[in-house]
Amino acid sequence: MPSSKKNPTLDDVSKTIIELLQEDGRRSYSDIGRAVGLSEAAVRQRVQRLTDAGIMQIVAVTDPMQLGFRRQAMIGIRVSGDTRVVAEEIAAIQAIDYVVITVGAFDILAEVVCEDDEDLLALINDSIRPIDGVLSTETFIYAKLQKQLYNWGTR
């Protein structure tokens, strides 16, 4: 969810709506309205504006292991040339769900969820390494997910 604006200004009501949805994405608009002093319709409109602006998403977060995906990994990618172009190509790969351009040992980090090790190897060898500009990859296989939260607040 790349942001379209650099620093959108949110009022306290919008921030509270976001925080309430971070706690429970299924919370009703009428419940949120009671908490922030707005009507259900006003909350619905604010949520729609926040999602349309790319400020937030409301999604179901699944446990990949429960769905049959046995391998999760972060792939560090070193690049020559325009990192943004390579990152766009990597982001277009369906099996990759998270791509960031970084400053440090790797130019790009990509998070993947695969069915098994064979699927992971195929993804790296057939989809990532052939991209023009990819110099090398290093894969960090997740042994155990210790913590994953999405409630970092709104400042």
Where are these regions (language model features)?
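A compositional/biophysical signature of low hydrophobicity enriched in polar/charged and small residues
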Residues: M1-R155
